[in-house]
């Protein structure tokens, strides 16, 4: 409570402009001025094409038994998440004036996650193409995920160890210690369905997962600000981005003060880890610059953090815009991995377009129009659920006939391919997946997480381009 009062006092010092139409995006002006010199960070050269070469020991590894018996949920004490200490005054200098602030649906007077409430879910499910079958599939998926949570609250890509091999297709062995990434992928579908550690049928599941993330993170200080490092050798900054999204969404949905410190500290680590070109890669401040895939997860975390009124330095978003400019081609309709591409790369283009939507490009921007056209031509890729996950978000926000066609095919395919086998009921596995950093490496857990979040796309977030706002230009 004291922390919230202090934040409100600081916010009271910020001059707020006249009310404007609120749009769910992040934006910032580029001032043209160079930011502060980034401290040199020396690391080994990394081959971006082979993540398996980056194995290292987790600082505090979590023991995983070779086989585990399922445990019954135990009554939970009040929230015992260890907070990361910080002072509100530490962030006062990072807050942007009202004219430069990052805009979001949660700004000042809108509930950030209202789309996940029971009544709004029903409306958005109906309006944007969900149905009873897709919701039933989500319910079964959450049951499968809950059955595969470890006793310590974590999830593992070696999910078969938790269920004593009752369902197969675990992730690759070199992902076995990516507990933070796996736990985030286990948690996010619950929160997408409106479940929190405070309310819902699965609140104890969510509580244990959040507690694990906070306790397994590595607290520290960077640039005078507290950070919570959730990266790990088997998942690097992919792990941090995913885990930061989970912490920030949980805080945005509940405003639980116990999560404020960890969520803000996780955001601070993203700010610290940004590369000189404005993107993110496997390691903090990697000298060879960012890549679109890792950058996408960090931008999603920044968006989730700002939806919870956490503090995002405008220069971080300015850097992101520079990175997107670097990797775009065809006037922003296509996006490469670490530089511009001469051919359509499905997954990185979908990621780049979603980042553009979140950072201010409106529905009529030529890059958005042409990019959406390109994704619509590609359609659903049944061998790349990672692409499908991002493309579904882009097309759903864009709306119209292209989304309707894409949605029906993707929705019905996912519903029809959900496992009905006894041990694996409610899950998915795509054995021929070509996904970059997706189910091919994360196994049945990653496949199930992506598929479930796709089926929650109707209500996971409010639409960026609502009919009433579609004609408005976003004020930069």
Model-derived regions: residue spans:
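Patatin-like phospholipase
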Residues: 213
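An alpha-helical repeat/solenoid feature that recognizes helix-turn-helix modules
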Residues: 7, 93-143, 147, 157-205, ...
């Amino acid at each position: 409570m004291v922390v919230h009062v202090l934040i409100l006092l600081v916010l009271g010092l910020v001059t707020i402009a006249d009310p404007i139409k609120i749009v769910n995006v992040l934006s910032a002006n580029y001032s043209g001025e160079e930011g502060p010199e980034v401290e040199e960070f020396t690391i080994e050269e990394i081959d971006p094409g082979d993540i398996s070469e980056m194995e290292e020991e987790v600082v505090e590894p979590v023991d995983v038994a070779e086989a585990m018996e399922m445990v019954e949920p135990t009554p939970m004490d009040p929230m015992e998440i260890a907070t990361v200490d910080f002072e509100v005054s530490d962030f006062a200098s990072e807050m942007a004036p009202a004219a430069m602030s990052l805009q979001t649906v949660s700004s000042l007077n809108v509930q950030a996650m209202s789309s996940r409430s029971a009544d709004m879910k029903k409306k958005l499910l109906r309006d944007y193409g969900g149905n009873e079958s897709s919701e039933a599939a989500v319910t079964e998926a959450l049951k499968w995920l809950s059955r595969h949570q470890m006793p310590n609250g974590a999830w593992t890509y070696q999910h078969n160890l938790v269920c004593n091999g009752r369902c197969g297709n675990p992730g690759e062995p070199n992902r076995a210690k990516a507990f933070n990434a796996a736990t985030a992928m286990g948690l996010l579908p619950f929160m997408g369905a409106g479940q929190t550690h405070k309310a819902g049928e699965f609140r104890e599941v969510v509580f244990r997962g959040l507690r694990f993330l906070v306790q397994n993170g590595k607290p520290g200080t960077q640039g005078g600000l507290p950070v919570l490092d959730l990266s790990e050798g088997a998942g690097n900054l992919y792990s941090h981005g995913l885990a930061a999204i989970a912490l920030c969404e949980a805080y945005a949905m509940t405003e639980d003060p116990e999560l404020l410190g960890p969520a803000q500290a996780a955001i601070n680590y993203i700010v610290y880890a940004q590369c000189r070109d404005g993107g993110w890669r496997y390691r903090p401040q990697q000298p060879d610059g960012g890549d679109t895939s890792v950058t996408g997860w960090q931008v999603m975390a920044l968006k989730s953090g700002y939806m919870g009124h956490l503090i995002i330095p405008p220069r971080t978003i300015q850097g992101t815009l520079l990175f997107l400019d670097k990797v775009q081609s065809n006037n922003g309709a296509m996006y490469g991995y670490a530089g511009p591409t001469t051919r359509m790369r499905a997954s990185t283009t979908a990621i780049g377009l979603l980042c553009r939507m979140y950072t201010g490009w409106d529905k009529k921007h030529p890059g958005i129009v042409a990019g959406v056209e390109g994704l619509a031509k590609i359609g659903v890729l049944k061998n790349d659920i990672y692409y499908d996950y991002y493309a579904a978000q882009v097309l759903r926000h864009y709306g119209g006939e292209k989304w309707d066609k894409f949605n029906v095919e993707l929705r019905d395919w996912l519903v029809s391919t959900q496992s009905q086998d006894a041990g694996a009921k409610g899950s998915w596995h795509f054995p021929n997946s070509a996904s970059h950093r997706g189910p091919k490496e994360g196994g049945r857990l990653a496949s199930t997480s992506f598929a479930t979040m796709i089926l929650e796309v109707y209500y996971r977030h409010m639409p960026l381009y609502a009919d009433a706002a579609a004609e408005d230009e976003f004020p930069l």
